[in-house]
Regions:
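Nuclease-adjacent, charged terminal/linker segments that flank catalytic cores
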Residues: 1-74
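Short, well-structured alpha-helical interface segments that form or flank functional binding sites
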Residues: 70, 74, 78, 112, ...
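Conserved catalytic cores of phosphodiester-cleaving nucleases, focusing on short active-site segments
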Residues: 117-130
């Protein structure tokens, strides 16, 4: 399965659904707040009513005010669905993070990002990244931190897909080649094997 194509198709569908949602929710507080903040940011050169009408009648304007599918955990949800994995909690006492000693902890301060899934007997982080740049490099650093700290005492995995990871997955594998507690894979690889 080409997971990248699958995710991109799902994101496209989500964008269209999100445009319809922002139009449907035009009178709800979350949309009104976005409109109000936009008017303030542009020093009132347009009115709230101008923007409201634009959202309802212009797909380009609506697309600027709808929810961002990149922030809706689409790839994480699809990865879990495709692989038949249950999402682990991302906060609270049952959350799985690692501290500097490789111990499992639940607090976020000074510790790794939370594990997303259990894949076989590995605590796994899952990332889908489609571009280059600072934010993407931060995601890579989060994965490296998770693998380094988690592998001190546990088996850990990175399930990484998307164009960014097509480039960096081999580099990551090389970096952790001598660590038997680390498994680096992708949804595409897991579904093809």
């Amino acid at each position: 399965m080409d997971f990248t194509a699958y995710v991109e198709n799902a994101k496209k569908k989500a964008r269209l659904a999100n445009i319809e949602e922002v139009r449907k929710d035009i009178d709800k507080s979350w949309v009104k707040e976005k409109i109000h903040n936009h008017v303030l940011a542009f020093d009132g050169i347009m009115t709230e009513e101008d923007i409201r009408e634009g959202i309802l009648n212009n797909i380009i304007i609506a697309s600027k005010f709808c929810k961002d599918p990149g922030k809706q955990n689409i790839s994480e949800n699809l990865a879990g669905e495709v692989l038949g994995l249950t999402k682990l909690v991302s906060s609270g006492k049952r959350c799985v993070r690692f501290n500097d000693a490789g111990d499992i902890v639940s607090t976020s301060t000074g510790n790794t990002k939370s594990a997303d899934f259990i894949l076989k007997d590995y605590y796994a982080t899952q990332k889908y990244t489609d571009g280059e740049g600072g934010a993407q490099d931060n995601q890579r650093n989060d994965v490296i931190d998770f693998l380094k700290r988690g592998s001190i005492k546990h088996k850990v995995a990175a399930i990484v897909d998307g164009p960014y990871w097509d480039k960096y997955r081999p580099i990551l594998r090389e970096e952790f080649a001598s660590n038997p507690n680390v498994w680096i894979t992708s949804v595409t690889e897991l579904t093809e094997n």
